[in-house]
């Protein structure tokens, strides 16, 4: 049986351990990554005890400049802030150009050139496009005749009187189109 002195000693050691663990800063387990900037002297999580800590920032939102937005300077480990943001949560990315009066969400991308204003973000125009009614994302690569549809490729050499369709390849020395001769 355990003596009362041992129980009291065990209780005191347990209390000392609990007090010491509350006094030390909390560390994240091994393998967790911290990226982005964070205040060094901050050990308290945001709204952990039901009140706002003293190190919150008041920053005006770009959407509505009349009401301020409360943000925590210390974000939890692993949260990334990249790009510009207003009231969106951390980790939302804004890339490309965005019309400020348009109500498109963050993360919509505009790349390439866009002609019409009603085309959606994220539609890509690559290569040259001749007629205006061809949809975005159609690619023209290689040389083509005017009656050939977009996206047809001509590679290799083809004579003007050759009846082979586009996309047939001539490589090496040949008798018929597409047959290959290796070596000497």
UniProtKB/Swiss-Prot annotation:
Residues 24-25, 39-73, 130-142 form a propeptide. Its main location: secreted. Residues 1-23 form the signal peptide. Each flp gene is expressed in a distinct set of neurons. Flp-3 is expressed in the IL1 and PQR neurons. SMART domains: GASTRIN. Pfam families: FARP. One of its GO terms (biological process) is neuropeptide signaling pathway. The modification Phenylalanine amide is found at residues 35, 82, 95, 111, 126, 155, 171, 182. It is found in: Secreted. Belongs to the FARP (FMRFamide related peptide) family. This is FMRFamide-like neuropeptides 3. It comes from Caenorhabditis elegans. The gene is flp-3.
């Amino acid at each position: 049986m355990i003596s009362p002195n041992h129980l009291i000693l065990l209780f005191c050691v347990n209390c000392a351990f609990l007090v010491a663990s509350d006094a030390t800063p909390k560390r994240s387990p091994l393998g967790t990554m911290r990226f982005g900037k964070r205040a060094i002297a901050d050990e308290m999580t945001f709204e952990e005890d039901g009140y706002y800590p003293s190190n919150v920032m008041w920053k005006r939102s770009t959407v509505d400049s009349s009401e301020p937005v409360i943000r925590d300077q210390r974000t939890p480990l692993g949260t990334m802030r990249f790009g510009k943001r207003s009231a969106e949560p951390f980790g939302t990315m804004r890339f490309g150009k965005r019309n400020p009066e348009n109500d498109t969400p963050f993360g919509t991308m505009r790349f390439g050139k866009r002609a019409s204003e009603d085309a959606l973000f994220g539609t890509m125009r690559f290569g040259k496009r001749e007629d205006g009614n061809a949809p975005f994302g159609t690619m023209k690569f290689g040389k083509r005749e005017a009656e050939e549809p977009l996206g047809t490729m001509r590679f290799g050499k083809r004579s003007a009187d050759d009846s082979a369709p586009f996309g047939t390849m001539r490589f090496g020395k040949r008798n018929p189109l597409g047959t290959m001769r290796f070596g000497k």
